[in-house]
Structure formats: C-alpha cells, structure tokens
C-alpha cells in the first residue's frame, strides 16, 4: 500500500467516524496531517513501510471500532453507530471476567455505559 492511499483511507475513516462532530473532525484531520509530516523525512523503505502499515491499522481501527456518543437531556448517551462498526457477537458474555481482561487495560476496573433508548 502506498503512503498516499493510506492517507486517503485515514481521511475517509475520520470522515465516517466524526461526520457530525466538526471540532473532532478537524482535530483528527490535523493529527493525521501532523503524523504524516513527522514521517516525511523517512528514507529507508522498511521505515516507510512500517509507518504506512501503522497508519492503515489506525484507519481500520477508527473505521470499525470508534463510535460517537451524544449526551441526551436525560443524562444518557445516544451512540451513533454507522454501517462499518464491528458489533461482534455475544460469545464473550459466556467468559468469566478473569478470561476477558479489561477493556481499559487497567485490571479490576470496569466501564459502565448507560442504556440507549
């Protein structure tokens, strides 16, 4: 994959994930641009390939895992799922907490989400 294609894919992923949130959309685009500019001096093909691979992985993560939430008047969040979000299955419910680990990476802490209506 070329750097140009990886950059375009990153911009597409950001546009999908942050389509209704202009401040976050602008900040995400700026972050991608600054990442590209910081890697512009890379000359070794291995380094360039690694940077392109990393950008592609970030794009896939954003596109498939990032969901925007909007705080409602009742204090709950409305999650704006788009068609490319990976919803997964309920097989992990059968696992114990020890087998699953932690979503936040911190052992013993849990993440609570309010129900969406």
From Swiss-Prot:
Gene Ontology terms: biological process: mitochondrial respiratory chain complex III assembly
A single MF term (Gene Ontology): protein folding chaperone
Superkingdom assignment: Eukaryota
UniProt keyword annotation of Transit peptide present: yes
Protein name, UniProt field: Mitochondrial zinc maintenance protein 1, mitochondrial
Keyword tags: Chaperone, Mitochondrion, Transit peptide
Subunit record text: Interacts with RIP1.
Function: Assembly factor required for Rieske Fe-S protein RIP1 incorporation into the cytochrome b-c1 (CIII) complex. Functions as a chaperone, binding to this subunit within the mitochondrial matrix and stabilizing it prior to its translocation and insertion into the late CIII dimeric intermediate within the mitochondrial inner membrane. Modulates the mitochondrial matrix zinc pool.
Record's subcellular location: Mitochondrion matrix
Classification via InterPro entries: Complex1_LYR_LYRM7, MZM1/LYRM7
GO CC annotation terms, alphabetical: mitochondrial matrix
Family of the protein in this entry: Belongs to the complex I LYR family. MZM1 subfamily.
Predominant location category: mitochondrion
């Amino acid at each position: 994959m070329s750097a140009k294609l990886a950059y375009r894919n990153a911009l597409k992923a950001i546009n999908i994930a942050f389509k209704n949130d202009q401040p976050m959309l602008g900040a995400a685009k700026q972050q991608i641009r600054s990442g590209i500019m910081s890697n512009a001096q890379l000359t070794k093909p291995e380094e360039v390939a690694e940077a392109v691979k990393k950008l592609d992985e970030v794009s896939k993560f954003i596109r498939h895992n990032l969901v925007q939430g909007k705080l409602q008047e009742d204090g709950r969040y409305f999650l704006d799922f788009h068609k490319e979000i990976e919803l997964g299955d309920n097989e992990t419910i059968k696992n114990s907490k020890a087998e699953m680990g932690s979503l936040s990476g911190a052992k013993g802490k849990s993440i609570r989400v309010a129900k969406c209506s």
